[in-house]
Design a protein with these regions (language model features):
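ATP-dependent carboxylate-amine ligase
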Residues: 1-122
Length: 122
């Protein structure tokens, strides 16, 4: 949770310059039995940030989604393969996207694929 807090704080320090900030939040897998508490805590960081919309992927992140302020909610994605088509319709040139989650969620594959096909949006 410390690394995700730092990531959100650093993301918030980047100037929006009239553009939008999107956060794709995947499960943090290595947290043990108190995982739900830590996922809920992340929503507080999101709510206190300048992130415009948050999309979540994974059982734990999806359960915490309801704690994100309504105006900051993107949606729950139940299939990792729906990410690129969904986000490609939303993100405009110059918008900012942060993807964060455990390696086990394979989110790195999304960012690799997204950068290959849509690097103009980052």
């Amino acid at each position: 949770p410390i690394s995700i807090k730092s990531a959100i704080e650093n993301f918030s320090n980047i100037s929006k310059n009239g553009k939008k900030k999107y956060f794709f939040f995947g499960d943090m897998m290595e947290l043990g039995k108190k995982s739900h508490i830590y996922h809920k805590k992340v929503t507080k960081f999101i709510n206190n940030s300048d992130i415009d919309k948050t999309f979540v992927y994974g059982k734990r992140s999806s359960a915490a989604f309801k704690f994100i302020k309504k105006n900051k909610r993107g949606e729950i994605l139940d299939n990792i393969h729906r990410f690129n088509p969904k986000i490609s319709k939303i993100i405009k040139n110059g918008d900012l996207l942060m993807i964060k989650g455990s390696h086990a969620t394979k989110l790195h594959k999304i960012s690799e694929n997204y950068l290959r096909g849509n690097n103009h949006a980052l």
